[in-house]
Amino acid sequence: MNVKTVEPGEGVNWFAEGWRVFKLNPIAWLLLLIVYFLVAVVVSVVPLVGKLALAIIGPALNAGIFRGARNLDEGGALEVRDLFSGLLDEQRRGPLLVLGLIYLGLVILVAMAGGILMFLSGGAAWLHAMQSGGFGMHMPLVGIVVTLLLSLSMLLVGAAIYFAGPLVLLEGMEPFEAVKVGIGACLQNVLPMLVASAVFLVLAVVASIPAGLGWLVLAPVTFAAGYASYKSIFST
């Protein structure tokens, strides 16, 4: 598995490619994503364990979307059952669920690290304020920096797991190796991902104008763009 470092402009091309893949079968995309969001809502509202369960099966569901997108891109069909293909695959189900547990563990770890940093930095800022006789701008600035670091860490974890899912399902990679490769791919392609994020933000504003109806197109195009980024960055 080779990981490419692509040009920043690829971030725009991913959405163009996502639009192309979406146009191959718009109805199938909409049906698949409606089922996806219904599953997410139903699972997440289960008391006590719902959100934990969704975090664990989430990578498998996302990987199933990648499999369906690849089938469609290669001349096959995109079907609703593709969404569950990772969970129904006897060989890949276990590794995908392990990947979900890794994701859950990383999220908890980052959140704990953020809390500890906030506590320690807050204590240091308080001590500085006591010594200098005033709080000034130090305490809010510390909070902003810690929040920014926490947000960036969460984004990196999310992006790495987003790539790790298809690496496990489509390439047969083991979960920990897939996470390692996913993180490396994200770090190698920060600029195109930032460009893609900027494109998404602009499109999100446009999609929200007509009573949010534009999201019926933007949501599947964004998922298809995610597949396009995977195809662009990874090669066998």
What annotation goes with each model-predicted range?
Residues M1-T236:
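Hydrophobic alpha-helical membrane segments
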